């Protein structure tokens, strides 16, 4: 991942209002950031932001009340040595939290070394939690997929398929049935956690749906505020296909999944043909997926009943084993 755009200046600009940050000194080091190696080796954002720790270099160091009190109890020699070690680590920047004054020696060393030094009245714990959440979003794996992303019955569903199969028309019908639009054509997905992928609409395409023959439709203006969503977790992919008779698997014995940012996402394939009510089929697929997430598998239950019936000697099942 390219980390060149993540530096002290960008982090300050994005969080100054939320964290009430003030840039005390070290403005010349605005380009300081994280090395690619430190980001690659980080198991989570906790490795990139934390309380003062001289063992972990190249991370955002936050000094709270406890760290400042410890500093004050040290001898002049120990203070100088600790400050020298801290600056030598070349952290992206330092934050003195809790509204306590920054030690004069720390300010002087940050000025001389062009190390950005921020201050905030907020507690160190609040600053660390907020910056960790921010870093996890910034550095999360991302991908842009083609399709129509909808909120159907509270589940994030991505409609995919070849061009011309009617994905946008199907999306429009589902919206008219009370479901919500997240994004059309291009959907930005980001993996924010170990078990979920979140999808959003690019700002340029917000609330828009393109339908052949009608052009661009502003869904929010036409259907109202409740017809659009800002984001949804991706739980199901519905792939629309057009295949000749005899080439479509009616009862797939194995659950289909698609890898999205390293996470397997359930997939359902629906054949497009004249006379088929695709909106009803998609809704049924979503309801069935909800049952499967609750541990209810209709096909597996049927196969279990079939096996028991075939093994029962008193059963009138026509295909029982003799």
Swiss-Prot record:
Name by which UniProt lists this protein: HPr kinase/phosphorylase
Positions in coiled-coil regions: none
EC code: 2.7.11.-, 2.7.4.-
Protein's job: Catalyzes the ATP- as well as the pyrophosphate-dependent phosphorylation of a specific serine residue in HPr, a phosphocarrier protein of the phosphoenolpyruvate-dependent sugar phosphotransferase system (PTS). HprK/P also catalyzes the pyrophosphate-producing, inorganic phosphate-dependent dephosphorylation (phosphorolysis) of seryl-phosphorylated HPr (P-Ser-HPr).
CDD domains, per the entry: HprK_C
UniProt comment concerning the protein's domains: The Walker A ATP-binding motif also binds Pi and PPi.
UniProt cofactor(s): Mg(2+)
Native source species: Paraburkholderia xenovorans (strain LB400)
Subunit text: Homohexamer.
Region Important for the catalytic mechanism of both phosphorylation and dephosphorylation, residue ranges: 209-218
Family listed: Belongs to the HPrK/P family.
Active site: 146, 167, 185 (proton acceptor), 250
Organism lineage: Bacteria, Pseudomonadati, Pseudomonadota, Betaproteobacteria, Burkholderiales
Gene3D superfamilies to which the protein is assigned, alphabetical: HprK N-terminal domain-like, P-loop containing nucleotide triphosphate hydrolases
Source organism superkingdom: Bacteria
Miscellaneous notes: Both phosphorylation and phosphorolysis are carried out by the same active site and suggest a common mechanism for both reactions.
Chain intervals for the UniProt region annotation (Important for the catalytic mechanism of dephosphorylation): 271-276
